[in-house]
Amino acid sequence: MASFRRFRLLSPLKPCVTFGRMLYTRIDKDGLTMLAGHLAYVSLLSLVPLITVIFALFAAFPMFAEISIKLKAFIFANFMPATGDIIQNYLEQFVANSNRMTVVGTCGLIVTALLLIYSVDSVLNIIWRSKIQRSLVFSFAVYWMVLTLGPILVGASMVISSYLLSLHWLAHARVDSMIDEILRVFPLLISWVSFWLLYSVVPTVRVPARDALIGALVAALLFELGKKGFAMYITLFPSYQLIYGVLAVIPILFLWVYWSWCIVLLGAEITVTLGEYRAERHHAKNVITQSPEM
């Protein structure tokens, strides 16, 4: 009787254990931490060029002139915890210096920013084991679209949010508290949609929408929890500040970027493993149904 109860308790957990083993094997085989380190290095190299190009795009659209200040605060508050103010000051100085660059230097900034997108593309296709190669023209078009349309869409969403909050009839309708709650989960929604687009569009193979949504949701939740945990760690255990002093912002930024890419790639591994697990179960069912006939 005890063994029967144990079997009943373990049987619902068996799919989870099997999926966990497949996920761990895949993460170990792909070298997730090494890939995340590569992307973290490229991200730090491309960070200033990427931010320069993004805010140059905002400057080209008058409707984003006022919202760009709020967007800066939103990005650094929600995507760079703990030391966002210090990093923001340094990056704004770098961006201000880059405005004095020549045309050749500006082209170099754009190429460096595109280098990050190319690296993300390469790493995700390694995870998906894709051998399909895009043409150079198509790849450049996709990279440029991500570089230009992504910031514009985020800026447009913030413009709409600010517009909704400015409407007087919302206060009378008593829905302002609901909008406040929506804006509170706005970073989570942006992360979820961004990861879903990343897992759906970047791989050169077809990715089931449901798998991409699940993987993106896990990554978005871990990203939000990671922000709070990282900020708590930096605040409660200020070892980096004690060791590095004023230079502590450098290892802290690198550590956060590395941790962020680990989360992004984990979401990608979950997305891929969901498809492989489903295919494995389908194959096992076919073997069971065919065995009596044999």
Swiss-Prot record:
Transmembrane regions listed in the UniProt entry: 44-64, 67-87, 108-128, 136-156, 185-205, 212-232, 246-266
Membrane topology: Multi-pass membrane protein
A GO-annotated cellular component: plasma membrane
Location, primary (coarse class): membrane
Compartments in which it is found: Cell inner membrane
Keywords (A to Z) from UniProt: Cell inner membrane, Cell membrane, Membrane, Transmembrane, Transmembrane helix
InterPro entries named in the record: UPF0761_bac, Virul_fac_BrkB
A Pfam family: Virul_fac_BrkB
Similarity comment: family membership: Belongs to the UPF0761 family.
PANTHER family the UniProt entry points to: INNER MEMBRANE PROTEIN YHJD, UPF0761 MEMBRANE PROTEIN YIHY
Protein name, UniProt field: UPF0761 membrane protein YPK_4186
Source organism (scientific name): Yersinia pseudotuberculosis serotype O:3 (strain YPIII)
